[in-house]
């Protein structure tokens, strides 16, 4: 879980950008199926410094749950197969994105395994409080595979 709370907004910019990972994957399955399959393939992404954390953008679990994990900064590195598909991923994210400005006293709480989050560039002295945590009541990670009208990638697809 992630909480972000605004104490002081930026003079300009700093809007919140949120995209539901389920909607992003559904868009990819429909518009760029090859990208959806590749982005669910194990070890196609490395997140973090040093050797990184080998991962993938969409992890398809046996129970049908699909958590999402994505960085688009200097701490993200990709398998050589992935870069040609990043424009399709970015289009899918942009097509699903919610954009809003937080005023003092406003914030949001989201499931970090389901929602993609970012912010726009800003000027001024923006001040937000951020906290990461685990829910008291167990929550399954990500979203359910059966939430799709189009067939999402399966583990079998991701290993091709």
Regions found by a protein language model. Name each.
Residues 1-160:
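Active-site environment of non-heme Fe oxygenases that use a 2-His-1-carboxylate facial triad
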